[in-house]
């Protein structure tokens, strides 16, 4: 394990009419789905980062929400802590935004998608630990906040 501090990310789970909002990323020809989210900026709270990332990537404003899940990812020297918020109130119409974090990386934000439970079960969603949590709590989004554990490749 690395001595470097972990990277902390904030992301948002937004459900509407039985569908979950996801963003599609492409990296080295590999397409996969994630929740809208990203890294904290200096001086930013987790909640502020989650709201900013949702706005940047989808154009939606998150008005209210709560912490829903914490998980970790370890791969070699890389350690990421993901903080997932559940959006309870939002405004706007979704549109494909930008992901400034990928500007100088070989990863691109290529789409936004609303997935129903069946489509989500078949989707290439990352991280898989969070995907299992989302599938298990699809019908009960008011589940208490939980620590999901550590995912390693």
What does each of the following model-derived ranges do?
Residues 30-33, 102-153:
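Nudix hydrolase/Nudix homology domain
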Residues 1-21, 39:
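Conserved N-terminal beta-strand and adjoining loop/helix that marks the start
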Residues 35-37:
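Thr-Gly-centered strand-to-loop micro-motif
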Residues 28-33, 77-79:
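A conserved beta-turn-beta hairpin within the catalytic core of GNAT-like acetyltransferases
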Residues 21, 29-30, 74, 121:
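Flexible, glycine-rich phosphate/dinucleotide-binding loops
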Residues 25:
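Short loop/turn segments immediately following the C-termini of beta-strands
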Residues 68-69:
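Local beta-strand/beta-hairpin segments that build beta-sheet-rich folds
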Residues 40-63, 72-126:
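Unchanged
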